[in-house]
Amino acid sequence: MIGRLRGYILEKQPPLVLLEANGVGYEVHMPMTCFYELPELGQEAIVFTQFVVREDAQLLYGFNDKQERALFRELIKVNGVGPKLALAILSGMSAQQFVSAVEREEITSLVKLPGVGKKTAERLVVEMKDRFKGLNGDLFNNSSEITLPTAAQAAELDAEAEAASALVALGYKPQEASRMVSKIAKPGADCETLIRDALRAAL
């Protein structure tokens, strides 16, 4: 199993990054909260990975540290939460924000995440709260106050389609993704900024 990759970033297409390690290019799906922290193209990055096998595909998910990966591993064990939804959850809010929301039973915050309805949010609170007790690290032992970001203005017309596609990949419906992008669209920002602001506005 591939647990860690160290290599150079060849491509960045949210939420996918192509990382070259020892001459091999690995396509890694990353939560947008982790994607934002990646270095620029051509620079070296270290990614902690989780290999997921499906009937129709073999996918590699990546994270900036082991605690984020541990959280992802526990999320996909929750009934009704697969890798795609787990990725969307950790894209909509940071790992720390999610832990805080669960600990404080913030159902209203969780239902704003893509693909998370009231029943799923309630299930996340019930199941994940118990799972946190068995995990090590500051992330799971320090429930800080959740910070809900405010909407920011950003976008460039030639980046809007790319941003909308990334939101669809994270679980939003095409029409909803386009509406989210249009709502915060303003000339002057790249695709990554557009995606980040759209997700912030959704909260």
From Swiss-Prot:
- Quick one: signal sequence residues? none
Show the Pfam families listed in the entry.
HHH_5, RuvA_C, RuvA_N
> From the UniProt record, which GO molecular function terms apply?
ATP binding; four-way junction DNA binding; four-way junction helicase activity
Where is it localised? Cytoplasm
Does the keyword section mention DNA repair?
A: yes
Region (Flexible linker) residue ranges read: 143-154
Cite the entry's keywords alphabetically.
Cytoplasm, DNA damage, DNA recombination, DNA repair, DNA-binding
Task: Map out region (Domain III) in residue numbers.
Answer: 155-203
InterPro entries in the record, alphabetically?
DNA_helicase_Holl-junc_RuvA_I, Hlx-hairpin-Hlx_DNA-bd_motif, NA-bd_OB-fold, RuvA, RuvA_2-like, RuvA_C, RuvA_C_sf
Free-text comment on this protein's domains from its UniProt entry: Has three domains with a flexible linker between the domains II and III and assumes an 'L' shape. Domain III is highly mobile and contacts RuvB.
Assembly and oligomerization: Homotetramer. Forms an RuvA(8)-RuvB(12)-Holliday junction (HJ) complex. HJ DNA is sandwiched between 2 RuvA tetramers; dsDNA enters through RuvA and exits via RuvB. An RuvB hexamer assembles on each DNA strand where it exits the tetramer. Each RuvB hexamer is contacted by two RuvA subunits (via domain III) on 2 adjacent RuvB subunits; this complex drives branch migration. In the full resolvosome a probable DNA-RuvA(4)-RuvB(12)-RuvC(2) complex forms which resolves the HJ.
Function, in words: The RuvA-RuvB-RuvC complex processes Holliday junction (HJ) DNA during genetic recombination and DNA repair, while the RuvA-RuvB complex plays an important role in the rescue of blocked DNA replication forks via replication fork reversal (RFR). RuvA specifically binds to HJ cruciform DNA, conferring on it an open structure. The RuvB hexamer acts as an ATP-dependent pump, pulling dsDNA into and through the RuvAB complex. HJ branch migration allows RuvC to scan DNA until it finds its consensus sequence, where it cleaves and resolves the cruciform DNA.
Q: What is this protein called?
A: Holliday junction branch migration complex subunit RuvA
Which gene produces this protein? ruvA
